[in-house]
């Protein structure tokens, strides 16, 4: 009865689809999934025919990030951008399930049974404005798919920052400095364990760098990151 009243529809364009949380063929084809070869740190596609072993992109080679490995599922453009903006600002929590499955597929080679999954935290003021932390939703789903631990309170954002949308890479790094800290009450959970930090979008990497540097205080075995979408470098 409910199925006839509310048939499944595409998450992006509302066209009829076969199952819940799905995309129609045109929208699916417009999602820019990232495939290998890609940067070992930030997941940016690398334009190279033959690469041997993990390789950084030019930006990560010149300025290595504060983590050891990273994966990204999508490029932040076309339908992927619309989907993420709907999740972030449009209360479209129904989009998290498929998005997390794509992220899990991209980062599952980084996961081990003892990996601790956490998410980039929101400052409480921004949390009140958005009502939820989209990175935390993704982290919960990824940890559930992998059947590993999720630590929602591992990191905390103790200083609000000005919006980063129009800031340069240098401005982003300056604004994010000392904004994220390891929660002392949860630090022991991180000791000698691999940690995976989840975020929805990576542009310059300043936010994830701040989160990774905060994790260092807990002496983890390894720090990795997983990003739902990577901003193309000509967009910042």
Short names for language-model regions:
Residues 1-199, 203-236:
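Glycine-rich phosphate/pyrophosphate-handling loop used in enzymes and phosphotransfer proteins
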